[in-house]
């Protein structure tokens, strides 16, 4: 939640695009809602994640399987585009359509690990030929006790419900490997597994 919130600096009434609605993207959707985004467009295809994105506040959900992301976003925003974007999925080619639907002065927060590809390609014209004031920030969530306490407070005081993320429950430490293998194999109905240790 915090990693996706900070890089693209969402503000009240922003139109925001969240690409990739796995656990990190879903928390990005939740962060956008908490920060007062007026329109939250989520990109994803798995039904369990699309349902969770709606729960967390996505106003629109699109899929890259039905055509270019930028065209969908521009249609949904009457040609205006979005103020901010979070890239939480995809690859090096994801930046191209996101930049194409980002308003001048817009910001992209990348929280996606780019494990393949040599270059991130930036479309020159849609980048404002270098003069569009479009920014890309990327990074991991900063650590520290204070940050974790603030995030825990969101759960404690009912501002954030993480239950929809927990799609698979395992009881006992002996099932840790089962949970990890489930994450590795990425079952269609998986968001996050949880392993519960008995007292």
Question: What residue spans do the PLM features occupy?
Answer:
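C-terminal hydrophobic helical "lid"/dimerization subdomain
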Residues: 96-99, 144-199
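Helix-to-beta-strand junctions that scaffold the AdoMet/dcAdoMet cofactor pocket
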Residues: 102-104
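Acidic carboxylate diad motif detector
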Residues: 111-112
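Rossmann-fold dehydrogenase core element
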Residues: 106-107, 122-165
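Single conserved hydrophobic/aromatic residue that forms the stacking wall/gate
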Residues: 1-7, 12
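Adenosine-nucleotide cofactor-binding segment
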Residues: 18-21, 33-97
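N-terminal Rossmann-fold NAD(P) dinucleotide-binding loop
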Residues: 25-26
């Amino acid at each position: 939640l915090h990693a996706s919130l900070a890089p693209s600096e969402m503000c009240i009434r922003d139109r925001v695009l969240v690409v990739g609605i796995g656990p990190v993207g879903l928390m990005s959707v939740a962060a956008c809602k908490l920060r007062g985004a007026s329109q939250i467009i989520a990109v994803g295809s798995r039904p369990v994640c699309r349902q969770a994105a709606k729960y967390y506040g996505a106003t629109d959900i699109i899929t890259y399987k039905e055509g270019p992301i930028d065209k969908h976003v521009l249609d949904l925003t009457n040609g205006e585009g979005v103020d901010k974007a979070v890239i939480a999925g995809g690859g090096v080619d994801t930046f191209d359509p996101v930049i194409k639907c980002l308003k001048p002065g817009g910001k992209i927060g990348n929280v996606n690990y780019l494990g393949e590809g040599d270059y991130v390609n930036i479309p020159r014209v849609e980048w404002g030929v270098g003069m569009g004031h479009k920014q890309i920030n990327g990074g991991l969530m900063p650590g520290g006790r204070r940050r974790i306490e603030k995030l825990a407070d969101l759960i404690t005081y009912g501002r954030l419900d993480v239950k929809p993320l927990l799609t698979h429950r395992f009881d006992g430490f002996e099932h840790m490997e089962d949970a990890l293998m489930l994450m590795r194999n990425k079952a269609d109905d998986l968001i996050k597994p949880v392993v519960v240790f008995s007292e």
